[in-house]
Amino acid sequence: MNNRVLLKSNSFSIVNLIIIINCVLFIPWVLNYVTHNGALLGLEFMFGALNIGFGDSIPSIDNGFQFGYQLLTSMFLHGNLAHLILNMYALYAFGKPLEKRWGSGHFLAFYLVVGILANIASYLFFSLTGAERVSLIGASGAVYGVLLAFGAYYPEIKVLLFFIIPLKIKWLVPLFAIFELFIEMTGSADGIAHITHLFGFIFAFIYCLIVFRFNPIRRMYFSPLIVDENERYR
C-alpha cells in the first residue's frame, strides 16, 4: 500500500466525527427514556428538526429563512434507537471506504450537500402537497446518497439484507429505490419520509455527475471501476 493511502487510512476520520455528533445529540432521547422527562428532547426537536406546516406555533422554516439552519441540524437527530443504529451502521460500513478514496473534505462536502438538498426537496414536496405538522429528522437522505456512491465503486460487494439474505450492492440499490417509491406512492402512514430517501439517491447521482464527473449507474452496471488490490473494501 502506498504512503498516500496509508496517510488517508491513519488520518482523522470525518465519518467517525459524524457518528459521534449523532450519538451525542441522541442523549436527550436517552434521558427522556430513563427519567421520563422530555423537556430537553422537546427543545431539541422543536429547534433542531425540519418543521413544516406548523404555522407560528413552533420555530419552522415556514416562518422565515432564519430557521433555515434546520435543513442541517435535522440531519443529526433521530427519533429512536433503531433509527440511529441503522443509519450510523450504514454510514460507517459504506462511508468509510468512500472517505478513504475521496479524502475527508470531499466526503464531508458530499454528505452535507446531498443531505441538505434532500431536505430542501422534501420541504418543497411537503409544502406543495399541503402537508401539515411534519417534522423531518434523520440522516437517511445523506446515507442513501452514500449507499449509491458506494455501489458505484464496489458494485459486486455482497451485504446481508435483513442480516440474512446475501445480495450484491448493485442489486440492493435499485431494490431500495423501488421499495421507497412503492411505499411513497401507496401513501403508507408509517411515519417515515420515504421521499427524502429517494431524494438522497437523486442528489447523490447528480453530485457524482457534476463534481466527480462519473455516472454512478453506468459505473455500477456497465463499466465498473477496476479497484486496486490495495484499496479493496474490507
How would you name each of these model-derived features?
Residues N37-F76:
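Extracytosolic (periplasmic/ER-lumenal) interhelical loops and adjacent juxtamembrane/interface segments
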Residues T35-G42, P155-F163, R213-Y221:
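Juxtamembrane/interfacial segments flanking transmembrane helices
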Residues I61-E99:
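Function-critical hydrophobic alpha-helical transmembrane segments in multi-pass membrane proteins
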Residues M1-I27, Y33, G105, F179-R234:
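C-terminal transmembrane module of polytopic alpha-helical membrane proteins
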Residues A82-L91, I137-L148, D190-F212:
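Alpha-helical transmembrane segments that form the membrane-embedded catalytic/substrate-binding core
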Residues N16-V30, N87-L148, I169-E180:
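Small-polar-interrupted transmembrane alpha-helices in polytopic inner-membrane proteins
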Residues F125-S135, L161, E184-I192:
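Membrane-interface helix caps and helix-loop-helix hairpins in membrane proteins
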Residues N2-V5, L91-K100, Y154-L161:
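C-terminal ends of transmembrane helices
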